[in-house]
Amino acid sequence: MQKYTNLYDVLIIGAGPAGSNAAISYKKLNPTLKVGLIDKAVFPRDKSCGDAIGPGVISALKRFNNEHILENEPQVVSTTLYGPENIGIQNYIPEVKNKEDSIVYVIPRIDLDNRILNLAKDLEVDVFEGYSFVSFEEDIDKKLVVEIKNDNHNLKFGTKILIGADGANSRVRKQLNVKKNSDWHKAIAIRAYIDSPNYLEIFKERSLMFEINVSAEKGYAWAFPSKGNLLNIGIGVPLSIFKKEKLDINELLQDFIEQLEKRGVVVENVRDEKSYLLPFASSRPKITQKVNVTLIGDASSMINPMSGEGIFYGMEAGYLLAKNTHNLLDSPDLNKGIGSYEKAFSKRFKRHYLSCALARLVLQSPFMTKRLLKVASNDQDTIDFVVELLFDEAYLT
């Protein structure tokens, strides 16, 4: 086997929030580690997403005093939920049980991801932008040899642990022979940006708007206000329903834009429409191989099945992985440390994910959506719980 040019303690494929936070966590827990971070894109780069980050992401940033990257961003103060027959509820974001802050920001991923990556660069993480993952194989001494490439070069690096944080279509996951989620455990969504000079006037404040079972039956649409007049809008539906009913994602987005206009929202300059897949955490992969390779973030199907949010879970996974393995990188027990990370993540989020999956089933029924919103309109605890499923780690008891 051809030898590698550099040996890393940790090599991470994918420099989104999950991968970058994993790199940050390893360096903060042990600054002497040699950490490499690889991404096929050159940053800053766009990423299709709703762009909303809540208390979980803020808490993950605060762990290592990195919350300063959120300075000067406007805070979202409420949520507005619409259901069938125009049932609507507006509610201030409640104090969540597990976090210091009950705050939401809407920051385009082209900015947010670049800021988090720069935090990793500041810690002297070696970053390789514009390089794609090719393959890995185990060397005779149990180290991993990882090949990456760009248009001009093929490079081989050695590493003690390889982390796949390379998204819903993870190449690392594919080489591990871990199947993709079935259509039942995935959604398809489309995001666009618009300008709206009167959105804050219509909703009286900076509010996240969710529309359930209106523009997309058995799915939901969103409008999230960012800086100035900028809004992130989009719509998502379960992939199984999307295929069965032969829906058109662009038509669904247009239907939602028309709904916004019916509510009085001025919609201007629709742009940057981009569709994407969301692998839900209702079907998380089990890695049975004994090589020191693991997955985090979308590559490991960590997306909330109710909200479609994945940034927080991916960032926490990166931290938990570093916490459970940073002191085992030269130990024969490294693989046990990877197993400890999986157990820790599952213990923390399993009941939450199950509760969100059940909520998803309820919200796929227009009848049940109407009932839930009617109850919530008269019961503060119910609406608070729904919001905590979206933004915290709440679960049914």
Where in this protein do the model-derived segments appear?
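Conserved N-terminal glycine-rich FAD pyrophosphate-binding loop of Rossmann-like flavoproteins
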Residues: 41-64
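Glycine-rich FAD pyrophosphate-binding loop
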Residues: 11, 25-49
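Predominantly flavin-linked oxidoreductase catalytic cores and closely associated redox partners
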Residues: 119-263
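Beta1/beta-strand and adjacent pyrophosphate-binding region of the FAD-binding site
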Residues: 2-18, 36
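C-terminal helical "tail/cap" subdomain of flavin- and related membrane-associated enzymes
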Residues: 323-397
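Short beta-strand to alpha-helix junction loop
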Residues: 52, 96-118, 192, 242-248
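FAD/FMN-dependent oxidoreductases across multiple families
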Residues: 241-324
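A conserved beta-strand/loop capping segment in the N-terminal third of enzymes
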Residues: 31, 58, 62-114
